[in-house]
Amino acid sequence: MSVRLSEGAIAAIMQGENVYKPVLQVINTRAIATGNGPPRYRVLMSDGVNTLSSFMLATQLNPLVEEERLSAHCICQVNRFIVNSLKDGRRVVILMDLDVLKTADMVGGTVGNPVPYNEGQGQQRSSAPTANAAPNKPQQQDGNLSVAGSAAPKYHAPSNQFSKASAPSSVKTPGGTQSKVVPIASLNPYQSKWTICARVTQKGQIRTWSNSRGEGKLFSIELVDESGEIRATAFNDQADKFFPLIELNKVYYFTKGNLKTANKQYTAVKNDYEITFNNETSVVPCDDAQHLPSVQFDFVSISDLENTPKDSIVDVIGICKSYEDVTKIVVKASNREVSKRNVHLMDTSGKLVTATLWGNEAEKFDGSRQPVIAIKGARVSDFGGRSLSVLSSSTVVVNPDSPEAFKLRGWFDSEGQLLECASISDVRGGSASGVNTNWKTLYEAKSERLGQGDKADYFSCVGTIVHLRKENCMYQACPSQDCNKKVIDQQNGLYRCEKCDREFPNFKYRMMLLVTIADSLDYQWVTCFQESAEFILGQSATFLGELKDKNEQAFEEVFQNANFNTYEFKIRVKLETYNDESRIKATALDVKPVNYREYSKRLIASIRRNAQLG
């Protein structure tokens, strides 16, 4: 494939002309230090006539350099770029999107004899047509460029096209000056004067803080336009000024503000930077911007959450398989009562996750018709497997108008509602109606190496008790309500608890029963603590402690009668190391009678799946 450079394109760009997908050659790339932020790359490029070092790579294109796809002498087509003016009048060209047409080894060196472009004087463009020579409606490029023996694509449509009608290209600021509107994607800390036209997709409440350095207030918003999204925060006087002015889902012109590297720990917004309002910031309503999108999502599959790090901020979409009633809890930090509701979401991966709604979101939620729920900015928790918490900065959309939602609804109505879904969340204290846990056979749990990662794993199984180890199955514990530490018999009628640093005239019995459970394929040693052990043995720890002292034979019979009973077990497995020896420790979190109706349904569903595989 023969490719020609867009001769004269650099001069046209720097003189403010519209250039359509110019073909340029990379002469050199250089990393620029940005402190704690992602690296920025400055690119020296050539159009065959001139070279220019004022090209900057947008951070989303960094992998092209880091993977050595964009290197010295390669030829690329610039699909989208933004020209920014600096305080000193110099121009910087931000490369937003490009395709590498020829790699460096295919080219072998510099094309032509280009000379540096001098921004202070116009350059001759001997072979470049003028902007007026461009067609009014340039053909869309499909990426399959075939230009052998023909002129390379030159100019001549706006470098920043939008398929829908766009907002005005400039706006008057409160000071009366005209300010050019730029896309969110072009914002960077090197700019001092800018205006964006964006929709407010999330607005938080005003929050206050107080510490040794003083006190203050703030609120944050999330903004979106056709090029991307960004988070903005107003502090103190700016918070008082802008909070009553800015409304959710409305469109505004935002002019001036400080741009800094975004703290990704607190936001899922896909932007390397965030805005802080300052004394020069202005916010002007825009009445003609119906083309702007609403909330932007970057959905993660529910099955992928199992491998997502704790505290990550993610976007998810799922069918509300079931939901729980609202409960009230008291937040320790503020001693304030808040509402809480768990909803259980599933997607086409067949996995189910528990998401917790808080406050007003929990109160007003209605999942009775199994709606599609999209959550932007949920935090991943590892409490009992994987679960999600909806934050004050999160956005919850019920039945969103999006292709993902339509696809999910169609899948659920046609087949998804009949599937047996496996939960990646372990909901303590029982589960909501219709919610199934992560059912496994003991063989599956071992073959899938559950518990051998950095985090504990959870699964449920149906197992039969085939052995109980009655030796050391109970111990004398501290009688305090919140302490289960083993006490030391002082041999004087008193029992000492090292944890509480007190002596007591009595103690309580606590159980730690080791049992072997088996199914048709494998077996597993499982540790059962107080409630689980008492359920299996059918007696309380207090009764068993007294029985052991008074009637050893009756004590033995309790264990014999507990053998060969079948239960549903909810099990936590984790690799633990003791005395330099590593082994899987399995702990029963819950033990209950088998629900044979549900168990039969699971077996039938499993048989059908295996039959289809065969």
Curated annotation (Swiss-Prot):
Stretches annotated zinc finger (C4-type): 478-500
* Residue span of region Disordered: 112-178
Keyword Aminoacyl-tRNA synthetase listed? The answer is: no
Q: Where does the source fall among the domains of life?
A: Eukaryota
Where is the major localization of this protein?
A: nucleus
Alphabetized InterPro entries for the sequence: Euk_RPA1_DBD_C, NA-bd_OB-fold, NA-bd_OB_tRNA, Rep_factor-A_C, Rep_factor-A_N, REPA_OB_2, Rfa1
GO cellular component, alphabetical, reads:
DNA replication factor A complex; nucleoplasm; nucleus; PML body
DNA-binding segment(s):
194-278
One GO term (biological process): double-strand break repair via homologous recombination
What family is reported? Belongs to the replication factor A protein 1 family.
* Protein name per UniProt: Replication protein A 70 kDa DNA-binding subunit
Native organism is Gallus gallus (Chicken)
